[in-house]
Every structure is written in C-alpha cells, then in structure tokens.
Amino acid sequence: AQISDTHIRADDDRLSARQLERALAEAHEYRADVILLTGDLVNEERADEYEVLARTIADVSRPLYLMPGNHDDRARIREAFPRHGYLQHLGFLSFAIEDFPVRLVAIDQIVPGETHGLITQAGAEWLDRTLAAVPEKPTIVALHHPPFRTHDMLFDDIGLLDAELFASVIARHRQVERVICGHHHRVAVGQVAHAPVIIAPSTSWVYGLAMYPGQKIAPKTAEQPGWMLHVRAETGGF
C-alpha cells in the first residue's frame, strides 16, 4: 500500500490525521503486506506535526515505512520515529527493505528549503549499488518527486531535476518492475526506461490542473483524496 502527501497538520482539527487514518484502515482491510508513506508526511516541517503523525500511526499492525518529501525535515523525522531503525543514519534517508517477496528501495532526493527534487551523483551511485546488490529479486523503487514530466505546469516546474540520471540507473537494472512516487497529489502514469511509473494520489487534497500558460487553476478541487494499492500477481508482474 502506498500512501502519499499526507500533509499532517497540528491545527486543522485532526482533518489530515483522520484522512490518513481512513487510508490506513482501508490498507489493513485489503491485507496490505507493507505500507509505505512516500513523502510530504507533514505540512510545515513542524515538530508538533510529526507528533500528530507519530500518534496516528502508532497502532498500525502492518509493517510501515516512511520517506521524506519536500515538506519534510530529515532531523525531525529521525527524532519523531526513533524506533524506525532504517531512518537512524546520517545524511539522506534512503533505504532498502528486504523482508518481502518484492524488494523495496526508497531514494531520498529532497533539497532542504526547496520544492523541487534532485538526484545527486552520490544518490545515483547509492541507487546503482543498492540495485546491483540484489539483481534477481523483483523490485519497486520509490521516490517523492515524479521522474517524468506530467505536463501539469504547476508540478513540472517543481519536479525532479536530473531525472535523466535517475533513468540511466533504472535502465541498468531490469529487476525494477515499477517506480512509485507522489508529490503531484493526483494519479498519473509514465515510464522511466523499461519501468512503469505510478504517481499516487494524496490523502490530503487534490490540486487543479495547469495545462497551458495563463490558465487559472483551483488551488484545491472537490475531487476525493485517495491512496494506491500495488498488487503483484503470483505469476509475476503488477
């Protein structure tokens, strides 16, 4: 189960927390093997927002993992989730989870103080080494910013820099069956090298689309928030 862009706030009468609780309950009902939150965990990087998030996920019985988005602060994530050992290292919050039939590799490409993402040379080398270490196991790669242009100018302008570098790494590793991300607040699909890319919706709100210059967009629409369930068939493939 992929839950993204939860934008937890401490001052919204628990609306954002309740929306996350609803998504978590549905993921549990569908017996998700694992739950991954793909960034923008909170809205303003505040410690009290991470406290609300920690309380909201405290009783989740399924394995649950967190990764940062451009609204997040790495140090505060570490402080709020000390029992999440995969987060307790210096530098980027990138990690690989080996405990399931599908390997999960999450790459942190956040630039502090900026809304865009960036694949650094060091990040690309880490991803390349991590994927090369287990070449035969089906793998999902997760990041926050979409690694392709969606043609929604609102988000393409604050998208992933050096997406070509990311694509060049993915192209070398055929076991990557899917790339998943968030940031866009709505479902969209694309492709990087051989791998389909799926953008999950947000549990918080949905922005209007900006498809041409000068277009007036709704900052928030009446569309329902959501989350994404990725299902792999027993015969292989998603």
Which residue ranges define each predicted feature?
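N-terminal active-site segment of His-dependent metallophosphoesterases
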Residues: 1-52, 56, 150
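Active-site glycine-centered loops adjacent to acidic/histidine catalytic or metal-binding residues
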Residues: 5, 39-40, 69, 144, ...
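A short acidic, helix-capping loop that chelates divalent metal ions and anchors anionic groups
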Residues: 8-12, 75, 113-116, 149-153
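Short gly/ser/thr-rich secondary-structure transition/capping motifs
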Residues: 18, 86-90, 160
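His/acidic metal-ligating clusters that form di-metal
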Residues: 24-34, 116-198, 227-229, 238
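Short catalytic/ligand-binding loop motif for oxyanion handling, primarily in non-cytosolic enzymes
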Residues: 45, 74-76, 148-151, 187-190, ...
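Extended active-site neighborhood of metal-dependent phosphoesterases/phosphodiesterases
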Residues: 47-133, 138, 165-175, 193, ...
